Amino acid sequence: VQNLYQKEFLLAQLEYDNKQTRADRKIGDYFNHISKDSKHDLACELIIELGDMDFWNDKTMDYKKQMTEVYKDQIYKLMEVVPDFKVANAVVHYDETSPHMHLVGIPVKDGYKNGMKKQVAKSKIFTKESLKTLQDKMRAYCIEKFNEVYVQNATLKKKQKGRNKDIHVNEMDGY
């Protein structure tokens, strides 16, 4: 994540700092600056899962590992759907109830008039509407790739309300 911050924000941070006449207004390291800021999240985590414990319970590890191809495709689809979410890391877990992928990334917004021109911007990138669109598109892409990899014609269960949560890092015990 720290390397991605350098890649995404260094030029904007240097431009901003060079315009500052007072040393106390200079940001220096944007990663450290945001990590000390209680108003912004340093990064966001998305979890992509297809199927539940009942579906995966009797499947072999080889069968489960075929999901790697499905999840790799999901990374590229996510970058198409949300180009302002820059993926720093993606890990697939096979050791729990069902194979699922954790993605960690930074929501980046360009074109700010105040402060740095480019900033971390979770609330601008992930709105209620954009999250609904994201989930709908990713569900369609995921089942399409699943059917291609597993040579099936499976369908998804209807979406359940209340399953998505925005969890602050301080509340993540047990996740």
Q: Across the structure, where does each feature detected by a protein language model lie?
A:
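N-terminal nicking endonuclease/strand-transfer module with a His-rich metal-binding environment
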Residues: 1-175
